[in-house]
């Protein structure tokens, strides 16, 4: 059910067309982020190919990204959300989240999950809140990534 969607605002574009994505821009940001520090370009490429991706562009220049891991019916996990630093403060992350949550299939899901260390205020505006019963959730972490400092 991956239908290409595009949203335009002024000179900015959000697109789910993977053909527009700039893999090197995405990798450069993610490999320096707290959540994917040191990730290889092959892992980024593989994660993109197995996700619904949203690229944010100023003209043809990619300035943001997010991806959703989903079954397009019941559950989605939003990951790797970013706007490059020089474009922050323009409302682009809010527009990106609006676009994700309005995407056909995601809009009707039972649950959409994400993890953040520092953007709780942004996500709360979209109805995200801490897990009500965290004791019901479990996670299995790969020891290799823990040794690299990734969480």
Regions flagged by a language model, labelled:
Residues 42-82:
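A conserved beta-strand-loop-helix scaffold within acyl/acetyltransferase catalytic domains
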Residues 95-110:
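Conserved acyl-CoA
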Residues 108-141:
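Conserved active-site alpha-helix within GNAT-family acetyltransferase domains
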Residues 87-96:
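Conserved acetyl-CoA pyrophosphate-binding loop and the N-cap/start of the following alpha-helix
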Residues 3-10, 131-149:
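Short, basic/aromatic-enriched C-terminal tail that caps enzymatic domains
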Residues 2-39, 149-151:
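Short amphipathic alpha-helix that is part of the acyltransferase structural core
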């Amino acid at each position: 059910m991956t239908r290409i969607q595009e949203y335009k605002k002024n000179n900015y574009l959000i697109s789910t067309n993977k053909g527009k994505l700039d893999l090197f821009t995405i990798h450069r940001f993610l490999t320096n982020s707290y959540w994917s520090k040191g990730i290889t370009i092959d892992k980024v490429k593989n994660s993109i190919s197995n996700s619904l991706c949203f690229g944010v562009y100023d003209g043809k220049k990619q300035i943001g990204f997010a991806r959703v891991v989903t079954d397009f019916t019941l559950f989605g996990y939003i990951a790797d959300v970013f706007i490059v630093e020089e474009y922050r403060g323009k409302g682009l992350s809010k527009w990106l989240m609006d676009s994700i949550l309005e995407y056909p299939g995601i809009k009707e899901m039972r649950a959409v999950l994400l993890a953040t260390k520092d953007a709780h205020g942004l996500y709360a505006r979209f109805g995200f809140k801490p897990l009500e019963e965290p004791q019901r959730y479990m996670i299995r972490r790969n020891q290799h990534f823990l040794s690299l400092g990734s969480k």
